[in-house]
Amino acid sequence: QNGGYRITTTIDKAIHTAMQNAVANYGYLVDDNTGQPEVGNVLMDNQTGAILGFVGGRDYQSNQNNHAFNTKRSPASTTKPILAYSIAIDQGLMGSASVLSNYPTNFSNGNPIMYVNSPGTGMMSLKEALNYSWNIPAYWTYRTLREKGVDVRSYMEKMGYEIPEYDIESLPMGGGIDVTVAQHTNGYQTLANNGVYHKKFMI
């Protein structure tokens, strides 16, 4: 009657409420006695990019940052499947059964590439390297992509990532990358959707 717009959102009320309740009831489980760790969470329809629910933080009154959409953090080892392995597989350079080196390796500055307290072991399959999130196989995979001239930047930009430098040796382990939970969820949406990226949306 007033000629206004009707805005429809993708948020599923039941899902969104369940996510808020989970944080309210179990958020304390991430406490480590050094302060109150924050949480951010996004649930997305992998086939469309529609956001079905999200958690912006544990307590908006005490911390008014939206940790799902605004706060950027290093994605650390969750970078490996997206920036290293998926691109190598797409390029036909390896498959899940490919054997990769996990022998002790140093960065160019001489510092060893560590995995917890381990400097490396031996050869292992890509599947095992990914399952246990070993660092050295990811390092060598990314180095191979660079040496073969694969345009990693193009892959990442097509998934909405904004990464300023690609010559960082620790990049596949999250070094030099800051991203929101929503954006990183969108990256994984691409993998779950057979490599087809759909930009996230709520309206």
What are the functions of these language-model segments?
Residues M19, G49, R73-L100, A129, ...:
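Active-site SXXK
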Residues Q1-N2, E162:
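Membrane-proximal periplasmic segments of bacterial cell-envelope enzymes
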